[in-house]
């Protein structure tokens, strides 16, 4: 398998060198393109002719010459190997040897396959070389040995007989998105979404909204939004003396903090009244023991 591949590559390089040594004219290029167009329309006819030519040959050492049509002078156009082709093959098909150099396209297709039988992509073939019109002695052909490894030519899918069907009318293959490009695009979209959300944009048109509750304000956490009603509140205390339970009741300002113990609190807002209706009837105001802070409460 490796020797066969090496032979295919060697033959292809020989074709390229022959074309570089003796460039073909623009008329031959136009005829070659027309010939390949006819072959792509009727691939079965070309394969049948190639089978007959390969019946007496040992492999790909000789090109497959097929009559494709007739030129203006009546001689058919052929597909040959170039200037290195012998005149014996032309005489076999009835073509004069003097017209072989003018009518031959000089394009021979060699394909390289791996050990599994799949065509190796990225190998530029001799049939992919495009010759510019009006070539002079100093002009060079596009392609060649230096570009054979970096080519993007699709050699097609090989059939059961080893021929590759090349679609010359297909559009060039476009590069796809990489995974890193997709991740970058998604990350940029999320970043833009958060950036606009911080500015107060709720995306009414796009339908994208990030509802983030505002952080609590520590200064407003301890105070209520509604003002405290001014006045007094009634407090109740239970006293256990070992035999009985005594219930004591008294009043404190509404704005004062509720604490443990019998404490007479003071007004902090300055608007609560000193006495209320219940304070006036309280008989223990003068006899009650008031504790002003927690350490004063006996255990």
UniProtKB/Swiss-Prot annotation:
Compositionally biased intervals (Low complexity): 133-143
Region (Disordered), start-end ranges: 40-94, 133-168, 204-229
GO biological process: symbiont-mediated suppression of host cytoplasmic pattern recognition receptor signaling pathway via inhibition of IRF7 activity; symbiont-mediated suppression of host cytoplasmic pattern recognition receptor signaling pathway via inhibition of MDA-5 activity; symbiont-mediated suppression of host JAK-STAT cascade via inhibition of STAT2 activity; symbiont-mediated suppression of host type I interferon-mediated signaling pathway
Principal location: host cell
Region (Interaction with host STAT1): 110-120
Subcellular location: Host cytoplasm
Domain of life according to the entry: Viruses
One protein family per Pfam: Paramyxo_P_V_N
Acidic residues bias: start-end ranges: 144-160
Site (Interaction with host STAT2): 240, 246, 248, 250
One GO MF term: metal ion binding
GO CC list: host cell cytoplasm
InterPro entries registered for this protein in UniProt: Paramyx_V_Zn-bd, Paramyxo_P/V_N
Residue numbers binding Zn(2+) 2: 255, 267, 269, 272
UniProt KW keywords: Host cytoplasm, Host-virus interaction, Inhibition of host innate immune response by virus, Inhibition of host interferon signaling pathway by virus, Inhibition of host IRF7 by virus, Inhibition of host MDA5 by virus, Inhibition of host RLR pathway by virus, Inhibition of host STAT2 by virus, Interferon antiviral system evasion, Metal-binding, Viral immunoevasion, Zinc
Annotated positions binding Zn(2+) 1: 232, 251, 276, 279
Self-association and partners: Interacts with host IFIH1/MDA5 and DHX58/LGP2; these interactions are involved in the inhibition of the host type I interferon signaling pathway. Interacts with host TYK2; this interaction inhibits the type I interferon signaling pathway without affecting the type II pathway. Interacts with host IRF7; this interaction inhibits IRF7 translocation to the nucleus. Interacts with host CHUK. Interacts with host RELA/p65; this interaction inhibits the nuclear translocation of NF-KappaB.
Family: Belongs to the paramyxoviruses V protein family.
Free-text comment on this protein's domains from its UniProt entry: The N-terminus interacts with host JAK1 and STAT1. The C-terminus interacts with host STAT2. The C-terminus also interacts with host PP1.
Record function comment: Plays an essential role in the inhibition of host immune response. Prevents the establishment of cellular antiviral state by blocking interferon-alpha/beta (IFN-alpha/beta) production and signaling pathway. Interacts with host IFIH1/MDA5 and DHX58/LGP2 to inhibit the transduction pathway involved in the activation of IFN-beta promoter, thus protecting the virus against cell antiviral state. Blocks the type I interferon signaling pathway by interacting with host TYK2 and thereby inhibiting downstream STAT1 and STAT2 phosphorylation.
Name of the protein this chain belongs to: Non-structural protein V
Species per Swiss-Prot/TrEMBL record: Measles virus (strain Ichinose-B95a)
Species classification: Viruses, Riboviria, Orthornavirae, Negarnaviricota, Haploviricotina
């Amino acid at each position: 398998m490796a020797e066969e591949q090496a032979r295919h590559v060697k033959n292809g390089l020989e074709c390229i060198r022959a074309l570089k040594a003796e460039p073909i004219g623009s008329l031959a290029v136009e005829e070659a393109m027309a010939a390949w167009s006819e072959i792509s329309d009727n691939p079965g006819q070309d394969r049948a002719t190639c089978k007959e030519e390969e019946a007496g040959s040992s492999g790909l050492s000789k090109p497959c010459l097929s009559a494709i049509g007739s030129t203006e002078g009546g001689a058919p156009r052929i597909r040959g190997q170039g200037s290195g082709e012998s005149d014996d093959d032309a005489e076999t098909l009835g073509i004069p040897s003097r017209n072989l150099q003018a009518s031959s396209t000089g394009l021979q297709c060699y394909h390289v396959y791996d050990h599994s039988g799949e065509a190796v992509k990225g190998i530029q073939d001799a049939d992919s070389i495009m010759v510019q019109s009006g070539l002079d002695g100093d002009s060079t052909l596009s392609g060649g040995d230096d570009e054979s490894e970096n080519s993007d030519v699709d050699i097609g899918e090989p059939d059961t007989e080893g021929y590759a069907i090349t679609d010359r009318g297909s559009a060039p293959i476009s590069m796809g998105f990489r995974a890193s490009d997709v991740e970058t695009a998604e990350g940029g979209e999320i970043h833009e979404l958060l950036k606009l959300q911080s500015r107060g944009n709720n995306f009414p048109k796009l339908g994208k909204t990030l509802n983030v509750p505002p952080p609590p304000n520590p200064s407003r956490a301890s105070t209520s939004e509604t003002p405290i009603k001014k006045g007094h509140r009634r407090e109740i205390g239970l006293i256990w003396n070992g035999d009985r339970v005594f219930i004591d009741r008294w009043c404190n300002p509404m704005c004062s903090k509720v604490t443990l113990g019998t404490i007479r609190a003071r007004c902090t807002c300055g608007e609560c009244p000193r006495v209320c209706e219940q304070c006036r009837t309280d008989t223990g105001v003068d006899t009650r023991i008031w504790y002003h802070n927690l350490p004063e409460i006996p255990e």
